[in-house]
Amino acid sequence: LEQQQLQGARCMECGVPFCQYGQMIAGMASGCPLHNLVPEWNDLVYTGNWEQAYERLKKTNNFPEFTSRVCPALCEAACTCGLNGDPVSTKENEYAIIENAYENGYAAPRPPRVRTGKKVAVIGSGPSGLAAADMLNKRGHSVTVYERHDRIGGLLMYGIPNMKLERTIVERKIRVMEEEGVTFVTNADVGKDIKPAKLLKEYDRVILACGASNPRDINAPGRDAKGIYFAVDFLSANTKSLLDSNFADGKYVDTR
């Protein structure tokens, strides 16, 4: 962790932290869209206060275990240290903070102390659905997440290659959320297996977090040629094949 502390020290050389604002400059996003308090938790990393760094990171980010692996690191592109050298490795520091939290018990489940008595249904278990469920559960509401597929996670589970985001990382967070009180229901296609009217009757609120699963097609010569697939369809089929292979080490290649 010494390298992360060194990078945290470099962050303190900055006078104007563009990294945390997520502004649009010349039509391009500059800085963190989540408005992560980057200089604050980098400073805590620098001083060795890892638990406080985790608490500060969680103020703005429900899932640093995901973003620290797949985020394009717009914060680093906006880092002023990068004007005269390499930017601060903020993404690596975020990864170090969250993994250190799991290793040392900071990221242990924290069920809400009080329940409000309100019930909320979330339809869809992708990033937005999980974030909504996490926030509502922390506020004491009883949350049930409905997912039409056989595993929780949406594109986190099926759309991102395992080399970028291992399925075990997604499953680890799901277990934490379950222990905090969130209920997950799989193979539940709302509108087909479950009537919307039933949910509206049983829950105080219903959140639609269905995602955008329909791809955009193109009108181009050769589009219908054999071997051309939509990216998400291909990735989803490949990942499902991997998950259903039952190989414990995840080292699975299907040459078909």
Residue ranges and their predicted role:
Residues 1-2, 6, 94-256:
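Residues forming the flavin
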Residues 11-14, 19-23, 28, 32-35, ...:
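Short cysteine clusters
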Residues 11-15, 87, 172:
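Short amphipathic alpha-helical segments with coiled-coil-like heptad repeat character
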Residues 16, 46, 76, 80, ...:
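Non-catalytic alpha-helical coupling and interface elements of nucleotide-dependent molecular machines
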